[in-house]
Amino acid sequence: MTTLPGPWGAVLYDTTTTHVRTAPRRPAFRHRGCLWLVDLDHLPPVPRPLRPLAGFRPQDHALEPTGEGLTIRQELERYLAGHDVRLGDGRVLMLTQARSLGYVFNPLTVYWCRDGAGRPLCTVAEVHNTYGGRHRYLLPPDPEGQGETPKDFPVSPFFPVDGHYRMVLPEPGERLRLTVHLERDGGRAFTATVHGTARPAGPAALLRAALTHPFATWAVSLHIRYRGIRLWLSGLPVHPRPPVHPRPPDRPPGRPPGRADSAPSTPTPTPALTSTPTPTEEVPTP
């Protein structure tokens, strides 16, 4: 199995993200940014002076704080084991934004998982919303990277939690081309695309990315809120937020579940919260 190119064994993509709503109105926007493709067994060895510009922390991806010191890969393995998928010694590539200047917000992180023989095992799409919620969609292997899954996680207050996603997430190479469609009764309601061009990651590439896309991950979060406010001001109705459970910053309220090969314990229940989002404070990615 070949390694990723470059001095750090990782890839940086200069990306263009587009969002197009097809119902009930047709607003669209385009945003430029930068994404990393990394091997979870060989995260980029970013030198200490450059670490404020790029970091990959388990707590930025874990569905729940584990308090167990698991790596990103180990936490993903536990998730997969809960769905009867055994990763073994296979490779996992992760496409994501890096933590930069103390902050990260990832609307979509994608994991491409292969078994020990290098065969495609599954694809995992990890979605974050600005409520602080996180959710994963598990897709079976497909030669074209295509898959469908019901939508069961709140992302935008302008869409209810219904319909299904049609995802096209092929493992990238020199080019990155991802597409996500939201299909609802009556047809396609929303399409998001991410296109990018690869360059090997290293000190020079990281500095170039920092200069080309300063405050990139902050800009994503602010841009989402700005677009949400504009949609709200245009008269688009807002759907109440479904009940959510807050994520403690460092550890769960009770003892976390054990590893996949250990007997899980029962965590202390956390009261559910409900509220109606206001576009000025919490407007997730469309």
Residue locations for each model-derived region?
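Mature, function-bearing regions of proteins
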Residues: M1-P269, L273-P286
